A protein has these predicted regions:
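Short acidic-hydrophobic, aromatic-tinged amphipathic segments that line or gate anion-handling sites
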Residues: 171-177
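A charged, well-structured terminal subsegment
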Residues: 183-206
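Residue-level signature of catalytic and energy-coupling elements of molecular machines
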Residues: 2, 37, 82, 93, ...
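Long amphipathic alpha-helical segments
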Residues: 1-65
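Glycine-rich active-site/cofactor-binding loop and its immediate structural neighborhood
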Residues: 69-103
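Short, hydrophobic beta-strand segments
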Residues: 31, 71-75, 121, 126
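Short, flexible coil/linker segments at domain boundaries that flank nucleotide/cofactor-interacting
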Residues: 67-70, 148
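Cofactor-cradling patches in redox/metallo enzymes
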Residues: 89-96, 101-170, 183-185, 190
Length: 207
């Protein structure tokens, strides 16, 4: 249903306004309702898909496309096949104006490192739903540090908690997908991973 709605709106409204003041705001509201346990995963997935389709239609009317705020590499930890959370976060990052390099699920540490070296993102995110796989994020962050790459490494997913995410150098935590763009904004504003940890509660606010 979103296709005809966006197409009709484009007759009188600029595409960026449709994206930023319509679709993105709508998804932010969905994120709040999810945090309040009014919406659950099925509603989040449906809203994310609707928003993705709507943004794709609106973006086609922007000469040269939208200017990217920055690049982020996203993946699911090695050995872990669960990618729903990562997919939702990726949609929310794209809708917020970021270029997402989505590596998919069960991504080997060397592949993550190689992608970071090639793409030069300002942030790398990993998710894990299994406790047996979350250690790959800690190991991956160590490889980046050893190579002199000091970008924040966001750890997320059902198996991950804040204590784990902040137990290794570069590590920061995201509890829910809607928090990812909020944290990304602070990184672009100059916050390093230590500053993100220090102000985490204020950054994520009510999400």
């Amino acid at each position: 249903e979103i296709g005809p709605v966006v197409t009709n709106a484009l007759k009188t409204i600029q595409p960026l306004e449709i994206i930023n003041k319509g679709l993105v705001v709508g998804m932010e509201i969905v994120g709040v309702l999810y945090a309040q346990h009014v919406y659950y995963l099925p509603e989040i997935m449906m809203a994310a898909k609707v928003m993705e389709v709507g943004i794709a239609i609106a973006e086609k009317q922007i000469p040269g496309g939208r200017t990217s705020k920055g690049k982020v590499v996203m993946h699911v930890a090695e050995g872990d096949p669960h990618d729903i959370g990562k997919n939702i976060a990726a949609v929310m990052m794209r809708s917020s104006g970021y270029e997402v390099i989505d590596m998919g699920k069960d991504v080997a540490i060397p592949d993550v490192v190689a992608c970071v070296e090639k793409e030069k993102p300002f942030l790398v995110t990993g998710t894990a739903l299994m406790t047996t796989t979350m250690g790959a994020m800690k190991d991956g962050a160590k490889v980046l540090v050893d190579k002199g790459i000091k970008i924040p490494y966001m750890a997320a997913g059902g198996a991950v908690n804040r204590d784990f995410a902040e137990s290794f150098e570069l590590g920061i935590y995201s509890e829910k997908a809607p928090q990812t763009p909020l944290i990304a904004e602070k990184i672009l504003a100059g916050y390093d991973y230590l500053k993100i940890r220090e102000e985490w509660d204020d950054i994520v606010g009510g999400e």
